[in-house]
């Protein structure tokens, strides 16, 4: 009996030793990234402080609400949105930039990774999302694109022949 207890204690200590670096990594990630967890149906079950900060909603305001709360109405009504959740429920992950709505109504861009979590019977039991606010980067890129487009539209193009005469203006 005592030998079995010693063996279990040793196994437990070994597992704790393996788990420690994972806990440290998770803690580091939680301090800098936004985390949110959903049911397979899209109901919010957990958020971290970073997610609340990025969206403007407190955890109490988010938990129990559907993912739709964070999306534009036109997106929610789209077939693309239904397909997005269908793919997640089929166990397919998603990574990319997504447009979401802040509590005050302004647009926020997130670099998001959605991970379906499965049980031992291969059923999706929850969806885990890790996100980073990239709004400033996306808006800066769009501003640059608009500026370059305006320059392209306003530039004059003049063609000359070999003698310097204008052939097309």
Language model: regions and residue ranges:
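PAS-family sensory domains
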Residues: 45, 89, 94, 99-108, 118-119, 167
């Amino acid at each position: 009996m005592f030998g079995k207890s010693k063996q279990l204690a040793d196994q437990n200590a070994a597992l704790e030793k393996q788990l420690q670096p994972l806990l440290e990594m998770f803690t580091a990630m939680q301090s800098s990234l936004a985390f949110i967890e959903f049911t397979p149906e899209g109901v919010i079950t957990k958020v971290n402080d970073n997610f609340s900060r990025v969206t403007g909603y407190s955890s109490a305001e988010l938990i129990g609400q559907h993912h739709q709360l964070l999306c534009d109405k036109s997106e929610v009504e789209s077939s693309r949105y239904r397909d997005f959740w269908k793919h997640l429920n089929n166990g397919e992950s998603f990574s990319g930039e997504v447009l979401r709505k802040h509590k005050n109504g302004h647009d926020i861009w997130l670099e998001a990774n959605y991970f379906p979590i499965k049980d031992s019977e291969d059923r999706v039991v929850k969806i885990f999302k890790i996100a980073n606010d990239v709004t400033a980067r996306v808006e800066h890129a769009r501003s640059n694109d608009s500026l370059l487009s305006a320059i392209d539209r306003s530039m004059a193009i003049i063609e000359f022949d070999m003698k310097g005469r204008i052939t097309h203006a």
